């Protein structure tokens, strides 16, 4: 993977689910709702001064959200940040940079 270029879409891993779980409360607070399901399906990553993760998450029924989560460099010791998100997504919607 080149620095700055997003990776190809990959199936979600246990690490991806952990990242999504760590920002779930941030999303639920911003959307003012609780999601009955929160399962990471796929992701892309982008190496910057840290790592951006673009994660497609199933949130119940036919509903999906796309998350952009920033993970700082290890020596900075900062929590994960929900940088941006997109709601009203479907399973077939492409996971792209936003």
Swiss-Prot record:
Top-rank lineage group of the source organism: Eukaryota
Protein's cellular compartments: Cytoplasm; Nucleus
Gene3D superfamilies xref list: 3.10.450.10
Site entry (Reactive site), positions: 4
InterPro entries per record: Cystatin_dom, Cystatin_sf, Prot_inh_cystat_CS, Prot_inh_stefin
Assembly and interaction partners: Able to form dimers stabilized by noncovalent forces.
Functional description taken from the UniProt entry: This is an intracellular thiol proteinase inhibitor. Tightly binding reversible inhibitor of cathepsins L, H and B.
Family in the record: Belongs to the cystatin family.
Protein name listed in UniProt: Cystatin-B
Species of origin: Macaca fuscata fuscata (Japanese macaque)
Lineage: Eukaryota, Metazoa, Chordata, Craniata, Vertebrata
Gene: CSTB
